[in-house]
Amino acid sequence: MDQRFVPRQQALPVRVRIPALELVAPVDPLELTDEGRLAAPDSANRTGWWRAGPEPGEQGPAVIAGHVDSRNGPAVFYELDTLSPGNRVFVDRADGSTAVFRTYRSERHAKSDFPTNRVYAETAAPELRLITCGGVFDDRSGDYLDNVIVFAVRVR
């Protein structure tokens, strides 16, 4: 195993920074809903990390989600779909360290066809998934029909 990526104790994520979006946001722990979906963060201006998965920077795919908008306007991941391959994502952790990731792909999928295996399956290196809603808003369900998923790999 590459020693640069050995997990640290108590390296829980506390803040995500995406310079290309001028984004700095706190990170809260998230659980799965009774339906088995990742719960959304409580606040439109905060992100959430799936606490049952890897901590950002550990082996495997860490997942951080955020809202695209709210009744009051744009939310924390409003511009997530504008990220390009090569953009940097910094995850500041409770132990004072920062895990740095480089984006390599962005996808949009219908929520009914969410790529669960590609998002949550084990990876060869520490990776990060950033997820928000996208596509058309369905007034009847009160939700967007798609998800935007950004894939990133740890570089430092």
Residue ranges and their predicted role:
Residues 1-84, 92-97, 104-156:
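Solvent-exposed, non-transmembrane regions of membrane-associated and secreted proteins
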